[in-house]
Amino acid sequence: MNDTQNPLHGAEASPLGKPVAYRDTYAPELLFPIARQLKRDEIGVRADALPFCGEDLWNAYELSWLNPRGKPVVALAEFRVPADTPRLVESKSLKLYLNSFNQSRFDDAAAVRMAIARDLSAAAGGAVGVAVWPLGGQAERRFAAPEGVCIDDLDVAIDTYQPDPTLLSAGDEVVSETLYSHLLKTNCLVTGQPDWGMVAVRYTGPRIDRAGLLRYIVSFREHNEFHEQCVERVFCDITARCRPQRLAVWARYTRRGGLDINPFRASDRDQRADEAMEIRQ
């Protein structure tokens, strides 16, 4: 896919919130890439000096195609899009793209995996990792909270529902800990539909004030932005306000349209997100 076949637009030009005709034969042109830099400019992130590394992990639950004899195959899939790719893929377009496999014939799951990897890599502008598992072929998934401290039971008053980094602060004592909250709610950049999820913050550095962190997380409640952009905003705000020596931020959003999106951003390449799935996924 090149930019003349599928030119880059802002999110407002995407299929989100618009009636579309569903295609059931393979159509890679349905993928709609959006330049990450359009929103990174808002938080002072330069493409040539990213303050983080990481990836966007997508889980796909509604993937099907026909085998060479016309019999349907169903499968699960996982996509790992590096955070340093220049483009993200809009989620409704990815759903429409995956639906286009429904009446298309492929030799086997490996052929499907190769097609998806080729198309997503072209859309994102970098190598995207793809795994496809026919049912029963994937390791059992683990549902659990992150290893850390849930801050949701703190008794705090809250009246701010747009992102406010001034709610964040840190003390003098240096600690290593993971804090997380299930109270994350953001909204689709285009449609305003609510997106629900868990967000975790793992850091080494001055102790982050937990009440302030909870207020800050809740302050995204009326904010319209894509999942990936929200996590990058959280990472940058905590970096600026709390000055951690090491930091990782990840979110696990609930499923929509047969897909869930789980962005992960970290200060160091040796860090990994907890692979356990959020109970609402």
UniProtKB/Swiss-Prot annotation:
It comes from the Bacteria. GO terms for biological process: queuosine biosynthetic process; tRNA modification. Catalyzes the NADPH-dependent reduction of 7-cyano-7-deazaguanine (preQ0) to 7-aminomethyl-7-deazaguanine (preQ1). It catalyses: 7-aminomethyl-7-carbaguanine + 2 NADP(+) = 7-cyano-7-deazaguanine + 2 NADPH + 3 H(+). Its EC number is 1.7.1.13. The active site is at residues 188, 195. It holds the Pfam family QueF. It is found in: Cytoplasm. NCBIfam families: QueF. The keyword Oxidoreductase applies. Pathway: tRNA modification; tRNA-queuosine biosynthesis. Homodimer. This is NADPH-dependent 7-cyano-7-deazaguanine reductase. NADPH binds at residues 91-92, 256-257. GO terms for cellular component: cytoplasm. The keyword Transcription regulation does not apply.
